[in-house]
């Protein structure tokens, strides 16, 4: 699907059924980027954010331009639904509540934790919701299994457009459309190569980039 077509279909969907309501798990660097970008997109809205650090979720929504009065704490699924019905953004510390909330159409996992992401994805599927995996750590480990579980549940399991795997596939598709034979595909390294990097040495840089130090070091 082309980007212009996608934009048009989002508008059509919003006119007929209202915007797609997103539940976001995680408000770190990637999660915050999602909140900010969705605020600019017609046809989508962030309905709820689950984050073990609630202030991080609040800060992400404020950065996206939402008023503080439009951000409410929601301890359980019914509270999340009430917030969404009232046009608010719900902030919860409970991933289970996010998975169970009835007013959410699709979940984005931006936790970056493979164990949490896997268990959460399975719970999301059991609740009949589609899941976008912005958790490459989980996807690369057990994504094939999760894809099959989604098929059994009748929901969609997919990667995130804009993340590196999806961008690589877009480039492959473009090259094939030009008649090229693809023999290899991947990405170049855009971080320093440091074999001895440990999280404790990068706490300050990670905080400045709104990242987990362990994850930052993983890229080195």
Stretches found by the model and what they are:
Residues 1-123:
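N-terminal glycine-/serine-/threonine-rich beta1-alpha1-beta2 phosphate-ribose binding loop
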Residues 35-36, 58, 122, 144-148, ...:
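Predominant activation on well-ordered alpha-helical scaffold segments within soluble catalytic domains
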Residues 91-93, 108-109, 133-134, 157-160, ...:
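General beta-strand structural signal in soluble alpha/beta enzymes
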Residues 39-43, 55, 62, 66, ...:
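Generic secondary-structure signature for well-ordered alpha-helical cores
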Residues 103, 127-130:
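Glycine-enriched alpha-helix->loop->beta-strand junction motifs that scaffold or abut catalytic
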Residues 144, 151-220:
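Core active-site phosphate/anionic-ligand binding loop and the adjoining beta-turn-alpha structural block
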Residues 27, 51-52, 96, 112-113, ...:
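Short, ordered loop/turn segments at secondary-structure junctions
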Residues 111-127, 135-156, 160-163:
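Rossmann-fold NAD(P)-binding glycine/threonine-rich loop
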């Amino acid at each position: 699907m082309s980007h212009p077509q996608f934009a048009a279909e989002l508008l059509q969907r919003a006119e007929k059924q209202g915007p797609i309501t997103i539940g976001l798990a995680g408000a770190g660097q990637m999660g915050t980027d999602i909140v900010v970008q969705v605020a600019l997109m017609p046809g989508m809205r962030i309905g709820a954010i689950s984050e073990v650090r609630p202030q991080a979720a609040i800060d992400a929504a404020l950065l996206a331009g939402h008023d503080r009065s439009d951000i409410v704490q929601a301890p359980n699924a019914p509270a999340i639904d009430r917030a969404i019905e009232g046009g608010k953004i719900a902030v919860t510390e409970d991933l289970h509540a996010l998975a169970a909330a009835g007013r959410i159409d699709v979940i984005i996992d931006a936790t970056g934790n493979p164990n949490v992401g896997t268990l959460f994805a399975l719970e999301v599927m059991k609740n009949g919701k589609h899941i976008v995996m912005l958790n490459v750590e989980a996807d690369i480990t057990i994504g094939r299994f999760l894809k099959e579980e989604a098929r059994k549940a009748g929901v969609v399991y997919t990667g995130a457009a804009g993340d590196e795997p999806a961008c690589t596939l877009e480039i492959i598709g473009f090259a094939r459309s030009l008649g090229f034979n693809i023999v290899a595909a991947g990405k170049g390294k855009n971080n320093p190569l440091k074999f001895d990097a440990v999280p404790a040495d990068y706490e300050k840089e990670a905080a400045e980039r709104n990242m987990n130090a362990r994850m930052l070091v993983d890229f080195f």
